[in-house]
């Protein structure tokens, strides 16, 4: 959310957070946030910024901190879920139509007040992947929710199915690296170098999008060599037969971090709840183009939008990039047909 390395004290961090959230607060729009490597710095942590959100916009911020012992402390605190209901009449605590999951990929540097000294030399690097404890929390939390909903909902409600999900985590999982760099998807993904107005092409790729960041490490591969550091939460969510999340549809994993990428494409991840040859979609969120090595002339100003329809929330979701000009690009439905545009036999 903020470039914490530029702050001189915690008050400056708070002022920046309030500046970001003021339009949402004025409009009364609820929001949830993920945080990244620049938020863990001298005068802030992911957890302290979440506290600032709640203090400034109580009732609007849906961001939550994980229970104690989950996520790796205040630097990785924001592991939570947000329920999306079919309508405003839904009972509080009843089973939602959709779950938004947020997993904290940590990274950045330790806060000065969390070290023994006061100088820059005292800051320590924070691991750049979702803490393994989150995998255990996913298991216990999803099972708890399933029990709760089975006790409160009608017996015929979706035949006991766990709600579909959409996952947000700032630093992309290593699966993003694999999709962009290995076949069968690498030659069918991205390919766009400029999104300037009037300069639109898909290069006839099945999964087009901006691909200015051609080489990146993903979780576990930025400051160290990748050795499966991000597998704990992914395997818990998608593969553990004890977890209800593994039996439901995941509409995608959404990440930022790579400012120059905004493509969506399949991955090698398979959810037990999806058809045997279907892969979990991966989507880069669109960098807004305001700040953070601004490339607006080439990358354009925009956001990634997900549009859910309650009539088909179990089978797919519409997504596209919308620019400040009002233009939409890469409008697709993340469904079975889209997933199988390119045969995905890679294991």
What are these regions (language model features)?
Residues 1-15, 19:
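N-terminal active-site segment of His-dependent metallophosphoesterases
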Residues 1-2, 30-35, 41-42, 81, ...:
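Structural recognition of the beta-strand scaffold that forms the well-ordered cores
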Residues 4-9, 33-44, 78, 109-111, ...:
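Active-site environment of divalent metal-dependent phosphoester hydrolases
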Residues 16-159:
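Extended active-site neighborhood of metal-dependent phosphoesterases/phosphodiesterases
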Residues 43-47, 113-115, 178-182, 266-267, ...:
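Short aromatic-enriched loop/helix-cap "lid" or pocket-rim segments at secondary-structure transitions
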Residues 76-78, 96-99, 163, 249, ...:
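Residues that flank catalytic or metal-binding motifs in active/ligand-binding sites
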Residues 84, 220, 261-347:
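Binuclear metal-dependent phosphoesterase catalytic core
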Residues 99, 115-262:
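His/acidic metal-ligating clusters that form di-metal
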């Amino acid at each position: 959310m903020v470039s914490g390395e530029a702050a001189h004290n915690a008050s400056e961090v708070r002022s920046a957070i309030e500046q970001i959230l003021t339009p949402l607060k004025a409009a009364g729009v609820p929001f949830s946030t993920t945080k990244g490597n620049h938020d863990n710095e001298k005068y802030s942590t992911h957890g302290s910024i979440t506290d600032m959100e709640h203090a400034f916009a109580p009732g609007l911020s849906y961001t939550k901190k994980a229970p104690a012992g989950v996520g790796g402390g205040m630097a990785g605190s924001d592991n939570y879920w947000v329920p999306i209901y079919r309508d405003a009449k839904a009972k509080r605590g009843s089973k939602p139509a959709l779950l938004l999951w947020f997993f904290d990929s940590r990274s950045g540097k330790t806060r000065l007040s969390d070290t023994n000294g006061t100088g820059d030399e005292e800051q320590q690097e924070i691991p750049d992947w979702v803490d393994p404890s989150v995998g255990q929390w996913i298991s216990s939390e999803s099972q708890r929710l399933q029990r709760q909903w089975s006790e409160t909902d009608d017996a015929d409600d979706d035949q006991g199915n766990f709600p579909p999900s959409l996952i947000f985590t700032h630093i992309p999982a290593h699966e993003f690296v694999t999709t962009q760099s290995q076949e069968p998807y690498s030659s069918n993904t991205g390919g766009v170098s400029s999104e300037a107005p009037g300069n639109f092409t898909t290069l006839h790729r099945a999964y087009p999008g901006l691909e200015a960041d051609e080489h990146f490490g993903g979780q576990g591969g930025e400051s160290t060599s990748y050795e499966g550091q991000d597998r704990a939460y992914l395997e818990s969510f998608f593969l553990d037969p004890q977890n209800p999340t593994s039996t439901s549809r995941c509409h995608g994993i959404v990440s930022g971090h790579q400012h120059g990428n905004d493509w969506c494409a399949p991955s090698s991840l398979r959810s037990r709840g999806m058809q045997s040859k279907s892969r979990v979609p991966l989507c880069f969120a669109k960098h807004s183009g305001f700040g953070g090595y601004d490339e607006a002339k080439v990358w354009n100003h925009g956001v990634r939008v997900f549009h859910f329809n309650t009539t088909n929330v179990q089978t797919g979701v519409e997504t596209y990039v919308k620019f400040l000009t009002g233009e939409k690009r890469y409008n697709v439905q993340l469904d079975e047909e889209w997933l199988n545009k390119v045969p995905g036999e890679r294991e």
